[in-house]
Amino acid sequence: ALIHDWFLSESFGGAEKVTQILDEYISKNFSEPDIFSLTENITNSRNNIFNRRKINTSFIQKLPFGKSNVQKYLPFIPFAIEQFDLRKYDLILSSSHIAAKGILSSPDQLHISYVHTPMRYAWDQMNTYIDHSNFKKYGLEIPLRYLLFKLREWDYISGSRPDYLIANSKFTSRRIKKYWGLESDIIHPPV
């Protein structure tokens, strides 16, 4: 199984390209992996990296604006990623900048996670995220801070779920060590 946080045409960047390369490599050398993502909204052919294959999505896909603005459902992302049933797979590869590394696997499965960053919203960019949200304007800064505190806890716990962590850079490896207390190997992205 291959899992990535989400696929959106308007925010198609390096993490998505890495996932595409992983898919191409696995498909060429083994068989096409089943693909999972919280949401998918690939609307143009340039970004249709999976040749119109089915992408298994979470319940967030069906919520209003879930396909196009998954961040609106930030409080539900940990729950949503944990709902994927991946029991039939021996190998799980996750490409994660928020949640994909948090999928639930069994001791009989190998989970390798290529980490682009620990959850920025919850760690060093928390105050920037708060400043750019409308929560302050509506007097909801304290509830937002509490939510981010809970997301930080989940990010810390879920960081230890993969059997093997790969960081995309020395900087990301340092962030993994600082925020999760874990070691990671570094493999620079081929993009």
Feature roles, as predicted:
Residues 171, 190:
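Carbohydrate-associated surface elements
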Residues 94, 166-167:
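Short beta-strand scaffold positions
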Residues 91-94, 105-136, 185:
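Active-site proximal beta-strand in glycosyltransferases
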Residues 102, 174-178, 186:
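Phosphate- and divalent-cation-binding pockets in alpha/beta enzyme and binding domains
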Residues 133-165, 173:
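Membrane-proximal helix-turn-helix segments that form the acceptor-binding/catalytic region
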Residues 25, 29-101:
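Active-site donor-binding segments of glycosyltransferases and PAPS-dependent sulfotransferases
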Residues 15-26:
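Short amphipathic alpha-helix
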Residues 1-12, 39:
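Nucleotide-activated donor-dependent transferases that construct or modify glycoconjugates
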